[in-house]
């Protein structure tokens, strides 16, 4: 594992290093964050139904791998790693009324890349921060980080013309 992942093999040895999810939600939205990759694997709107009211099918913005978030990491030992393939350690806390999910990709006990998701009460907007600590000896700082974010949107209404009319 050390041979393939270098310093980030540390994250693969943690108890959270499994294909599992952490849920963070409020009254209007529910998110499932993947431990592998640290990205949003599912996003469901709790107060909106697909097709017609009473159908019971909630609008799912993200599901079935239709979204991808990845940062390409160039290491000092000439490895190219993708965050989507690495395990993050989740920590869910509350700060006041806000829920904060910290997803850390660790190269050691005190060195990491962190994705932080912040969900406020009754709010559809999600705060998202990326920060690092202690990675200057691990990452090649002469090369820029490439952020890749893709989303293939689902059709949530039966009529595509209706959906296009109210979507921008």
Walk through the language-model features, giving the residues of each.
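Soluble non-transmembrane domains of integral membrane proteins
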Residues: 1-168
